[in-house]
Amino acid sequence: MKKKYIFPLLALCFTGNAFSQTLSQAQKWFTEGKFAEAKPVFEKLVRQAPSNANYNFWYGACCYETGELSKAVPYLEKSAERKVINGFLYLSKAYYDLYRFDEAIQNLEDHIYWLERKKRDTSEAET
C-alpha cells in the first residue's frame, strides 16, 4: 500500500524541482539580456498562470526586447495593472515605439511615482 504512494510523490517532487530550475534559468537569462532564450520559458509560464503579474512582465519584456512590440503590450499592460513597477517602464517604451506618446508619458510618470513610493532611486527614469 505504501509503495503505491511513493512513486507519485517522487514524481511530484522532481516536477516541482524542474519547474523551479526552469524559472530560475529563465530569470538568469533575462538578467543577462538573453531575452530570446528566456522568452519561450516565460511564454509557457504565462500560459500556465495567466494572472501572474511577474510572468506577464517577464514575457512582455522579452517580446519587447526581441522586437515584438504589439505582442508585448497586452502582457505589459496586465503587469502594470498589477503594479509591477518595471512593467510601467517597459509599457512606456513600447507605447513610445508605437507612437502612442500620451500613453507612454503617462506610464513613465506612473513608473516614477511607484519608484518614489517604494523609496527607490528615480534619477535614471527622470532623464
Regions found by a protein language model. Give the residues of each.
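Canonical tetratricopeptide repeat
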Residues: 58, 90, 124-127
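Register position in tetratricopeptide repeats
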Residues: 31-32, 65-66, 97
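Alpha-helical segment of the N-proximal tetratricopeptide repeat
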Residues: 21-44, 48
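Short coil turns that delineate tetratricopeptide repeat
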Residues: 50, 82-84, 116
